[in-house]
Each structure stands twice: as C-alpha cells, then as structure tokens.
Amino acid sequence: GNQFAESVLREQLSQSNLKPIDRHMVQEMVFGVIRNMILLDTWIDEKATRPPGKTRARTILRLGLYQIAFMDRIPEHAAVHETVATARDLRLHSQSGFINAILRGFLREKAIFLKRLEDWKTTQANIAYSHPNWLFKKWKKQFGDTEANKILQWNNQIPSSYARWNPLCG
C-alpha cells in the first residue's frame, strides 16, 4: 500500500532470523536497487530481447544486477547463482533461464556497462543517477546543466548514518 520501503523492510527484517550482518546486506541491496532503479532497468532492457514488464522477474533481475555491479564483497558467480535460486524459490521456474542468461550476459560485458555508466554521468545523468527525465529537465532549466548534475549526484548518494547519545535518556 502506502508504506515507505524503509518501514516495510524494517518490519520484514524484524520477523526474520537473519544475522545482523545479513540484515545489513539485505538492506543495502533493497535500498541500492531503489536508488539505482532507472539505471538497472536500462541495463535490463538493453540485454533482454524481450524485456520483462513490471514483474517479479524484473525485480529479481534488479537485485542480481545490483549485486554484480555494485557489491564487490559478493562473488559474481554467487550473485548469479543466488538470484536464479531466488527465482526458482518464488516459483518462477520458466523465467529462471532468462534471468540466468541476462545476468551472465551482463557479467561478460560488465566492464563495458560500467564504462558507459561513467560516460552517462555527463551525457545522460538522469539514467546514471536514476532520476526521471522530466525532473532532470526541470532542474536543468531551473539551475543549469552543471548544478542539475550535482543535484542528481548528491540526491543519489548513500546517506550517511549518524548516532548520537542523548543525555536526557540516560
């Protein structure tokens, strides 16, 4: 419904038996996919001859691509294997071969995709920083190209975490 991803994720993780380190990894993947959704969808649509619509298969592909592209501590073969296994666990047996093919294809061309991502930061910043084109155009008109790019980059950063001690709470 109308819940924010953070509250839904917090609720789901509170009901899980995951270790804290695994909870952190899940949280990083979920928020990373949300933060990079337009970019991930662009990559999916480029690799797939028949891109999946707004389906669970697309969501699973986003998770797999995010792990491969941005999470260095997860071995690439493990990301592919676990993503395909997740598809099967969710009864997407008919889609598992498709998901495997897209992820392996991305792996073969990962360096090319990441190079293009760097190029897009100046040529197609709305895709590189996963913001809708209409919003990017509005910001460019309002602030100019350079400032609009800076806003996109800033807005797509992983937020800093802060903890502070409240002396009133003891």
Question: Could you describe each region identified by the protein language model?
Answer:
Residues 1-170:
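Class I Rossmann-like S-adenosyl-L-methionine
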